[in-house]
Each structure stands twice: as structure tokens, then as C-alpha cells.
Amino acid sequence: MYGIEYTTILTFLISLIFINYIFKTITSTMDFIIYRFLFVMVVLPPFVKTQNYGVNLPITGSMDTPYINSTVSESFLTSTLCIYYPNDVTNQITDNKWKDTLSQLFLTKGWSTGSVYFKEYADLASFSVNPRLYCDYNIVLMKYDGNSQLDMSELADLILNEWLCNPMDVKLYYYQQTDEANKWISMGDSCTIKVCPLNSQTLGIGCSTTDPTTFEEVASIEKLVITDVVDGINHKLDVTTATCTIRNCKKLGPRENVAIIQVGGSNILDITADPTTAPQTERMMRINWKKWWQVFYTIVDYVNQIVQVMSKRSRSLNSAAFYYRV
């Protein structure tokens, strides 16, 4: 009887010692693995240059907020630059290889061959309808025209700023603008905009809501129109919807990866709608040369300074995106 009890106790003690040994072995092994992993994590980062990519936002999200995607200072060798120019350039420059020449000159400023793109547009009106800004950095050249100052100003306001836009059904609803950042942006082949302000009884002020001919015309046969009316008052609108799309837009802030260079003119265009504020000239520059070769030489010389006042972004912009988030 006593022998059986001693044997049971001895077996229990041996099992306890064995289990304790197993636990110590497992603990030592885990310590080794954890310490080795931590050692590797501490030692390797200084020797590895990684890039942290952000979340791929849906189309309804912000398309133009600059996202810093790199853990190190970014080199121009990894960026793309688009230069948009009017067709007047090709009418003046007869050299068929002028783009290759400029690419070689940009190479001397740190921009690799193939990272600089030259894109031609016919006129400001057509460019405003479909502003394809695909590069990391976008520079738009606008030749000054005294007869097109307002068109240039509206286009500059459109592409230099980020807008959040929603559809408008002008046949069914009244609309009002809440503040200075709230505008109605119309784009199309031919936009004619008429407005009728309403009082608190929804009766027209100086116009009849049932007769569009009594509405006040604020734009006529335009491709791009930014409409500003009195804030806080409902308006009935009449729009040529067959050839024009109008959106209720809110200016969210600057689009930092776009700059405009005005070619010619005595002063830089003022794109600020508020008459009480100083003109907005950020990322709006002027080159006063008569020849396009001289213009491009100046851009090559100052390209890195121009880019320094801009911010690289991670998404492109085209006209389809405009109708959701510009």
C-alpha cells in the first residue's frame, strides 16, 4: 500500500519536473526568436529606403489633397511634369524636334528623359471643358489676351483650386449660395445662364419665375462659367441644359500640384472673386517674353524653383472627375 503511494508521488514529481523543463525550453526559444526579431528590426531600417503608399481613395473622396507617400526626400527623377501650351507655340516654332531639345535641357536640371511631357491645347475655352491634369506637377502656359481676361481668370480659378461639386436640377428646385466659397460652375459646348432671385414667399424679385425671359442673364454662350450670386437668397435658374451642365460647388482649398504661367500682359490676372481682398497670385506667375523659345528657356531655368512652391499629389484629374470632385 505504501509502495503504491510512494510510486504515485514519485511519478507526479517526475512529471512536474519534466513539464517545468518543457516550459523553460519553450520560453528560451521564444525569447531567442523575439530578441532576434527585435534586433533585425532595429538594425535594418537605416539601410533600407522604403515607400509608404497611401490608401487608394474612391472617386467620391478628395482627389487633389497632397499625400506624402515617401519616407525620404523625393527626387525629381521619380516625378512627372506636364507642361500645357497653346497651339500658338507650334505655329511659331518650326523645329520638329523642339520637344526633344527641351527634354535634354530639362535633364540638366535633374528631370530625367521621359519625365517631362508637353501637351498642346487649342484654346482656353476647350481646355477648360476638359482639363486633363495627369502629372505629379502640372504647369499651364496661358498666353495673355486682353479680350479673354475673364475666361483666363475663371479657368485659373477652376484649376488652381479644389472644388467639391454636386448635380443641380434647375427645372425642379431653387438654389442658393451659402458663402463666398460656394459657386455654381457650368461647363459645356454652350452655356447661357439666367437667374431670378426670390423673396421669402418664393416670388421673383424683379422677375417672374414662370417667364425665363424676365430672368437676369449672367452668362451667354460660354464654355466655362463660374456664377456668383447674392448669398443666402434662393434663386430660380434657367440654363441651356442641352449643351451645358451646371454643378453646385464648394471651394475647398488650393490644388497644390498645379501652377499657371501667364505669358505677356502688364499684370498677373486676379482670380479672387472677393473685391475686398488682395489678388490671389500664389502659383500664378508671369513671363513677359514675345518669343516662345525665350519662354521655354526661362521655364527650364526656373523649373525647380517653380516646383518647390507646389506639392506632388497621387491622383490625376480629368473632366469626368470634375463632376464629382474637382
From Swiss-Prot:
Post-translational modification: N-glycosylated. The N-terminus is blocked possibly by pyroglutamic acid.
Cell compartment(s), UniProt: Virion; Host endoplasmic reticulum lumen
Cellular component terms per the entry's GO annotation: host cell endoplasmic reticulum lumen; T=13 icosahedral viral capsid; viral outer capsid
Statement: the UniProt record of this protein carries the keyword Calcium: yes
Region called GPR motif, residue ranges: 253-255
Domain of life: Viruses
Ranges that cross the membrane: none
Region forming the signal peptide: 1-50
Keyword Calcium set for record: yes
Keywords: Calcium, Capsid protein, Disulfide bond, Glycoprotein, Host endoplasmic reticulum, Host-virus interaction, Metal-binding, Outer capsid protein, Signal, T=13 icosahedral capsid protein, Virion
Gene Ontology molecular function: metal ion binding
Binding site for Ca(2+) 1: D95, G206, T214, E216
Glycosylation sites: N69
Region called CNP motif, residue ranges: 165-167
Pfam families: VP7 (PF00434)
InterPro entries xref list: VP7, VP7_1, VP7_2
Assembly, per entry: Homotrimer; disulfide-linked. 2 Ca(2+) ions bound at each subunit interface in the trimer hold the trimer together. Interacts with the intermediate capsid protein VP6. Interacts with the outer capsid protein VP5*.
Stated family: Belongs to the rotavirus VP7 family.
Function as written in the Swiss-Prot or TrEMBL entry: Calcium-binding protein that interacts with rotavirus cell receptors once the initial attachment by VP4 has been achieved. Rotavirus attachment and entry into the host cell probably involves multiple sequential contacts between the outer capsid proteins VP4 and VP7, and the cell receptors. Following entry into the host cell, low intracellular or intravesicular Ca(2+) concentration probably causes the calcium-stabilized VP7 trimers to dissociate from the virion. This step is probably necessary for the membrane-disrupting entry step and the release of VP4, which is locked onto the virion by VP7.
Protein's UniProt name: Outer capsid glycoprotein VP7
Organism name: Rotavirus A (isolate RVA/Human/-/RK9/XXXX/GXP[X]) (RV-A)
